[in-house]
Amino acid sequence: MKVSDRRKFEKANFDEFESALNNKNDLVHCPSITLFESIPTEVRSFYEDEKSGLIKVVKFRTGAMDRKRSFEKIVVSVMVGKNVQKFLTFVEDEPDFQGGPIPSKYLIPKKINLMVYTLFQVHTLKFNRKDYDTLSLFYLNRGYYNELSFRVLERCHEIASARPNDSSTMRTFTDFVSGAPIVRSLQKSTIRRYGYNLAPHMFLLLHVDELSIFSAYQASLPGEKKVDTERLKRDLCPRKPIEIKYFSQICNDMMNKKDRLGDVLATAQRIRRRYNKNSSSEPRLKTLDGLTSERWIQWLGLESDYHCSFSSTRNAEDVVAGEAASSDHHQKISRVTRKRPREPKSTNDILVAGQKLFGSSFEFRDLHQLRLCHEIYMADTPSVAVQAPPGYGKTELFHLPLIALASKGDVKYVSFLFVPYTVLLANCMIRLSRCGCLNVAPVRNFIEEGCDGVTDLYVGIYDDLASTNFTDRIAAWENIVECTFRTNNVKLGYLIVDEFHNFETEVYRQSQFGGITNLDFDAFEKAIFLSGTAPEAVADAALQRIGLTGLAKKSMDINELKRSEDLSRGLSSYPTRMFNLIKEKSEVPLGHVHKIWKKVESQPEEALKLLLALFEIEPESKAIVVASTTNEVEELACSWRKYFRVVWIHGKLGAAEKVSRTKEFVTDGSMRVLIGTKLVTEGIDIKQLMMVIMLDNRLNIIELIQGVGRLRDGGLCYLLSRKNSWAARNRKGELPPIKEGCITEQVREFYGLESKKGKKGQHVGCCGSRTDLSADTVELIERMDRLAEKQATASMSIVALPSSFQESNSSDRCRKYCSSDEDSDTCIHGSANASTNATTNSSTNATTTASTNVRTSATTTASINVRTSATTTESTNSSTNATTTASTNVRTSATTTASINVRTSATTTESTNSNTSATTTESTDSNTSATTTESTDSNTSATTTASTNSSTNATTTASTNSSTNATTTESTNASAKEDANKDGNAEDNRFHPVTDINKESYKRKGSQMVLLERKKLKAQFPNTSENMNVLQFLGFRSDEIKHLFLYGIDIYFCPEGVFTQYGLCKGCQKMFELCVCWAGQKVSYRRMAWEALAVERMLRNDEEYKEYLEDIEPYHGDPVGYLKFFSVKRGEIYSQIQRNYAWYLAITRRRETISVLDSTRGKQGSQVFRMSGRQIKELYYKVWSNLRESKTEVLQYFLNWDEKKCREEWEAKDDTVFVEALEKVGVFQRLRSMTSAGLQGPQYVKLQFSRHHRQLRSRYELSLGMHLRDQLALGVTPSKVPHWTAFLSMLIGLFYNKTFRQKLEYLLEQISEVWLLPHWVDLANVEVLAADNTRVPLYMLMVAVHKELDSDDVPDGRFDIILLCRDSSREVGE
């Protein structure tokens, strides 16, 4: 005997072990004493597991002092003969069972014994190992039987509720012990609670034909006594009253109104007595067991899922004859199989899944996304790895196939998704369960209760994937499913691992991933590994670390998908196929995010400045701050709570707390900032996120990309480092920190892309470049810059962060700004002001009579002072610092006689001053610097009459006021501007001046008139809380909107000066205090206004639209007013669009065929309309071949046939360089000066090359393969067809080519004018029938007509004659 772990045993007898290998008995007792460790251990029993080849041993520590800890788990390898076997011991106390424990292949014996005792209330039943294996299924799949129990109780409740007075129903639902009706006690609210108690009984009755309960129970009775019904009732019935009630009621309704399982067993025993004289009674008894199970399946309504294949009409003689012929003394019972039609997979399944998830207008982002979805769903490749940039839509790559699998009726697929961190769990489950397409549950449910038969996808973290319980359940999947669901049509689907690069890069967690190597990967249909930061080297190492072969040696191109027929080796030994979308697209990721690297003195102070500025500009936005340590996370959270609502997360929190906090931040719109370590940068999808700030000095390139990738739709990312401290040393095995310099170049180097250092297009969203940024991001940058300039001009700076942290949340403080209609920045709430209370008047100095002073420091008689510091008689001062007689001062700092001052700083006689800084007559108030007469002053600071007050810069009554240059008589000017603190801390105002600016966003909610206007607008435009567009507002149907939708229309569509004022509210273009936007509004009034302007453009030609812009000049700065003006004509505009665009919808939506032969003018006036489809295609390819050879600028050529050269355009490898080349040669500037493009904003045409036309781009790229086949069919030399950017340049040039447009509309009679670029692009992609009835895209016909206009075949002046004839015919027709 050789011991692998070199332990020495004092005494060991392995003869019994060796004999056990050949022993056929279920239970083998071994009396030997083996010292596995220092405590003597008695081996009670052991057996060989046929599947795993392990010998499983149950042992008991005879010398243990604590019997509850007497068992422990240990695996020891010993040499038995020539074979090495492993002995496994169970971790449990000695079971309370007379016959001794029998080990199970699935779980420890104590749970089985507990279940037997719960069901039968006895200790004397002796089952064989098969019974234990069957009983153990309950614990492995408890969730499934819980769901069945809920269904049973719901059915009972429905029956009782439908027939409450029926006597038979009352008997059925009657407690057999007390005889009292129990219908009233069964309520919907208690069904789930009672269902858990009922689940073991449901399991037992469904599997009654697989257990030896009947025969074993009789054998356990003493002496000659056989069946005793009362004994059965005592032994077999549950003891709890609640269990008695519901268990008896369902048994009553199932077995001919008989009570409980005891009567079922009594019936079985009577049948046994009938055949007691020969052994053939046993098979008959087994048949009854099958019948019992079948009845239960029928009663539960599971016939649609299960079909009992055995016959219920077999007689005893047939059974005896069959038994005699069988060598086995047990008859084989036919399995219950699932009866469902087979449904093959189809590529259309993915499209249907997308429409279920996103609506009928669903289209793929691009060709790569479509092919990858088909690869995952249709191909036989067992293991797939995908690298795609953050925000690309990696989730949909497996989400759509999972929905397609769930729609299949023949097989139930159960898939698993694992993410690296707990904080992603809640976010993933919310995203994947939307629209109800998938049933999603935590993987913990599967580990604890097993498969419930309902869930399609279980979601967990890497620790769950590595756990022993999970790997054991997957290893026993086939046996569990066959015994539980009685079918083999419940299969393991996909194993999906998100952000799998962590297996290699997370050095400190690699020891936790060791258990993954024990997972049976071959049990899954397919393994899918996803990441945004896993180049080939990282991906290969990560896959090998978890026990897979790694990547295929040959890197696979997504355009060369090949199917492998040799899959016999299994998933774990098969190389993983890698699809690198970043290399395929050759575009550097994250170009849509503006990345700024700043070195600052204090990272927290700079971060706070940026956050406050962001929330001043975008009050509803969110931000993420990444800190380097857990202590820093908590310190920042405590410090910033007084400014905005904060959620903080780090690794020391519990799993449930992480999930709860993440869900709160994602779903609660009032939460502003998420602070955490790097675990918050992976996988979280937050729609309102507009800023990411990173304070980690050890940030590596993967963490940077993951953090920036949270900004899905653009935004700002700041990397803040302390001066002279960025160079941080990386820990062993980790990636080095990022270096100073261009971030884009480091991203290119990481992904293995071509370096552009020192070349055009090097900077993409970094180093000040804004070329690739969206319009919203550019506008956000500009507004942040302007706000920073204002702060610098005002010399507002931040002092040091406070050393003590307050735990109270300052959200209440923010609510104060939002809730009060009378709040003012100059109010003082329960505090004393120590700095400039009761100071002098600023702005202008004037003496006025019968005038209106705005923002002035003045002495006035019979006037109205608005926002002034003034001395007034018989006047009303609103929001001013004034001295007044017989007046009412609201929100003012005033000197008053016989007046009521509300929240003002005032000088008063016979008045009441509340929350004010006041100057009064003949009295002195300590601690407030105020003088009053017959008045009450609270929390004030003021200047008085005939006195000089400290802490103020004012003197009164026949005096001269310093710093104001104002002359007053018997009056006091006080508190022109106060530094006020709402919470009694005067230092807060000096801490961060931006806080005062931040309050402006809340002041806009203060006016009653504004609130009233806001409510009116919300009622007039109710759908702005959803993703509504102006076409929905007009009343168009969704199928019409799909083709009329205004792709590419944004704020740059508006001419300069129209809805583009800066320094105002971004949503409504009003001053912040007059803002009419409301919380939860997803579509701004400004956006609806520019879409409404685009709708008006749809109905007008160039001259008419230019006149229209002049007519709406009063609304150029008022999008809300324009919307009201537009909505008045809502019905008229709808009818006009339906009338003018009926032809367009017929072609694009209903796909009516356009035939060139149907156009009489076309056949007579153009040779193109007499050409075949083959000739049109040849001409199209020839035009592009000539353009490519001559390096002609495409847009300019199709605009006016100018063959100007632009080599950079043809050599550009991405869209950014292409657009830069066009801008360099002045194409966009010439286009605006020569065409109607000047009626739009200066950036409108340029931005069409960004992300506006994704769906059309995807459709065009899908057609590239067709073009290649056409060239081969035509017999021409295959040439490169234009890529999307060049193709779009062609369409833009044709759209603004007025001469070409006029001729095309004249020749092709089926079309008319379209005045929006997106409609023109959509129209160009429809198909037309050429003269030989072959289909060609309309854009090919357009190029042919354009070429004909440029040729010498058209006589000079011929086209003008044609247009003249057309205009004449129109006049005659009209």
Curated annotation (Swiss-Prot):
EC number(s) recorded for this UniProt protein: 5.6.2.-
Induction: Induced in absence of telomerase TLC1.
First and last residue of the signal peptide: none
Top-level EC class: isomerase
UniProt region (Disordered), positions on chain: 832-999
Composition skew (Low complexity), residue ranges: 832-975
Location of the Helicase C-terminal domain: 609-758
Molecular function per GO: ATP binding; ATP hydrolysis activity; helicase activity; nucleic acid binding
Composition bias, Basic and acidic residues: 976-999
Pfam families (alphabetical): DEAD (PF00270), Helicase_C (PF00271), Sir1 (PF11603)
PROSITE patterns for this protein: HELICASE_ATP_BIND_1, HELICASE_CTER
GO biological process, one term: telomere maintenance via recombination
Keyword terms: ATP-binding, Helicase, Hydrolase, Isomerase, Nucleotide-binding, Repeat
Highest taxon above the source species: Eukaryota
The keyword Nucleotide-binding appears for this protein: yes
Cellular component GO terms held in the UniProt record: cytoplasm; mitochondrion
Similarity comment: Belongs to the helicase family. Yeast subtelomeric Y' repeat subfamily.
Family annotation (PANTHER family): PTHR31583, PTHR31583:SF2
Entry protein name: Y' element ATP-dependent helicase YML133C
Organism: Saccharomyces cerevisiae (strain ATCC 204508 / S288c) (Baker's yeast)
Lineage: Eukaryota, Fungi, Dikarya, Ascomycota, Saccharomycotina
